Amino acid sequence: MGQKVSPMGLRVGINREWDAAWYAEKTQVANLLLEDLKIRKYINEVYAKAAISRVIIERVKGPNNKDRVKITLHTAKPGVVIGHEAETKNKVVKELGFITKKNIILNVVEVRRPELDATLVAKSIAEQLEARASFRRVQKVAIQRALKAGAKGAKTLISGRLGGAEIARSEGYNEGQVPLQTLRADVDYAVAEAHTTYGKLGIKVWIYKGEVFDVQPRAFQEEKKPAKKFNKKPVAAKPANKEEKSSKEVK
């Protein structure tokens, strides 16, 4: 039987960047990976209601060759992440510095169209299901909003005890195109969980935004060399030979 792979992992290095942008020696990879997991877990707990879409972690060297961790948060609610007079942000930076024992740089990037972000759409559906909303209506509304915001296609799938049924099942909706086999297609994918009184529901969301032709990942980017300029001089027409002229006159 054919199995579906993650559309995000399949496109890493083609039209999507890595969420962890750092290199390390072989002996340090495991420790740094565990550190990344702790950072992501803490951020997801503190900003559970802040509509966090993506967390990108970079490791750079600061002054005096000190290790620094640069964290970029993509969110639809930057005001909630930063807090009043950056109080929440400073608190998070302090706690993360205590966890990692390193200097933390926290940047916040606003997601201007949350309807086109699969992670935010999946989290929104999960919150509505926990509030006992209709699973059919929630999916249809999410797809309509995505298409209205400019998506070329959207697909949703909810699995579990839908409506409190004793037998679990899956039900989903799709509209437009969602080409999972086209690698240049910009397909955003996310998974979320909804904890209801009847059990746990799984939510999957696919959003197709169009094809990407000119964007290259960082690993394959090359410096563009300036084109060579050639000074082309106009070529003067050669005068006809006397013999050619005389032959034409004879004809």
From Swiss-Prot:
Q: Does the keyword Signal apply?
A: no
In the UniProt record, what gene is named as encoding this protein?
rpsC
> What Gene3D superfamilies does the entry give?
3.30.300.20, Ribosomal protein S3, C-terminal domain
In its UniProt record, which GO terms are filed under biological process? translation
The UniProt entry, under Pfam families, shows: KH_2, Ribosomal_S3_C
| KH type-2 domain residues | 39-112
Q: What is known about what this protein does?
A: Binds the lower part of the 30S subunit head. Binds mRNA in the 70S ribosome, positioning it for translation.
Source organism per entry reads Anaeroplasma abactoclasticum
Q: What is this protein called?
A: Small ribosomal subunit protein uS3
Q: Name one GO cellular component term.
A: cytosolic small ribosomal subunit
Q: Does the keyword Transport apply?
A: no
Q: Which InterPro entries match?
A: KH_dom (IPR004087), KH_dom-like_a/b (IPR015946), KH_dom_type_2 (IPR004044), KH_sf_prok-type (IPR009019), Ribosomal_S3_C_sf (IPR036419), Ribosomal_uS3_bac-typ (IPR005704), Ribosomal_uS3_C (IPR001351), Ribosomal_uS3_CS (IPR018280)
Taxonomic lineage per UniProt?
Bacteria, Bacillati, Mycoplasmatota, Mollicutes, Anaeroplasmatales
